[in-house]
Amino acid sequence: MASRSAAIFLLLLAACGLESKPDGGVNGSGGLDASLDAGGIPASADHGRDILTTALQLDLATHHGTANITVASATGTGASFEVGDLDVTSVTNPLGPLDYRVAGGWLDVGVGSAPSQLTVTYGFKNHSNFDGWLNATSLTFLWPRFCGNLFPCHSAPADGVQLSLAVTGVPANKVAVYPANIPADAPAYMLAVAVGDYTYLKVGTTDAGTEVGVYYLPNGLAAAQTGTHNLDRAFDWYERTYGAYTFGNRVASVAAAWGPSGFGGMEHHPLWHVGTASMSDQVTHYHEAAHGWFGDGVRIACWEDFVLSEGTVSYLAARALQAVEGRDVWPSYQADLNAAITDGDTIALPSTCNAIDLIHDPLWSNVPYMKGAFFLRAVEQQVGAPALDRALAKFYREHVGQAASMQQLLDTIHAETGFDPTVLANGWLRSLGHP
């Protein structure tokens, strides 16, 4: 997510939270006793059971969804999914109905301990607080923990799932922009849908064969061309410098009608969203593109590792702009850093793991973006850009499709360059102010 969006969405989300079902829950399996359902297994909770794949069908006209889910094996016989304010109507497998219950925003199912497939049918609601399907603007907004308001999911950033999507119920005069398939493990919030009067413009193709483009709205061509200038070359630079892109061979920036104050973007690879107010801003487009490597390609282990995602891609965007445009963005980054510290300084790398609610925590600010970028720049000044790039590339190769922590990146930098970044990390990431 581009840093300029943080302040806007913080205000919009400050008062919202996951809507829960009544504590008593709702029992399913079509009214059958657990002993009579397809597996004869009573519903039970297992919040940690891994979701391997989710194939979604969303009808935007009826607000009906179907999720075909594959879960990994487990020692127990239950599986649990975040369902927010979804109205779950059935849970089945190929043999028939499964026993389920919905309580506290979670769906618990009895599925057995082996790898299992199940199908959940449900209704989803309109939302207006950037926390689900935004009917007024025909957009989804699921970051950071609102995927359960659109489909059964796990919202923890470390959890990865292979996603596919089919969308129906789109007005005849509109275009729905979404990825039909995301072939590599991705955080659940990465999935997105945008419906509008979109026109596609091809920007170019990288040496690896990745087509880079932009979807813009009426009267948005000039801004789209300005913001995505040389975006194909930047994407090519990311591929050559850090490694192969894993979310397909066609990517694009998508204009998102978040309103006149909705700045920044959101890392919905391979079709990331950029607010219409930021469509002319190259930094935002380059930043969101870089999330294909850090934040999405390599997921963060904890929300407290936010700097691994946002600080790293802020640094990468600056490097890419210098490489393909000869543009120095560090003076503007310095202004952003100064403003972030003045407005509300905080520790960029907390010592806890998933102990915070990010959208209600001071960490959700420009601080991790800018302190993270300047930290990596300080490392670059010690070891040189080529050596740091080799370390970042190795880290990406070793962790792509998985979750990792900022400490693991620090360890990789030390191992690959021989330079121990601890002192710099303590000054930039674990302290108030800056060195």
Language-model features: locations:
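Ser/Thr-rich, Pro/Gly/Ala-heavy low-complexity intrinsically disordered linkers and tails
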Residues: 1, 12-46
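Extended, low-hydrophobicity, Ser/Thr/Pro/Gly-biased non-transmembrane segments
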Residues: 63, 121-201
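Juxtacatalytic substrate-recognition/specificity segment
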Residues: 67, 102, 165, 200-305
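Zn2+-dependent metallopeptidase catalytic core
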Residues: 67-69, 121, 153-158, 162-175, ...
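Surface-exposed beta-strand/loop patches in extracellular or lumenal glycoproteins
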Residues: 68-87, 151-170, 407, 411
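A surface-exposed beta-strand-loop module
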Residues: 83-136
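Post-HExxH zinc-binding segment in Zn-dependent metallohydrolases
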Residues: 238, 265-273, 277, 305-346, ...
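Amphipathic alpha-helical substructures
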Residues: 246, 330, 358, 365-435
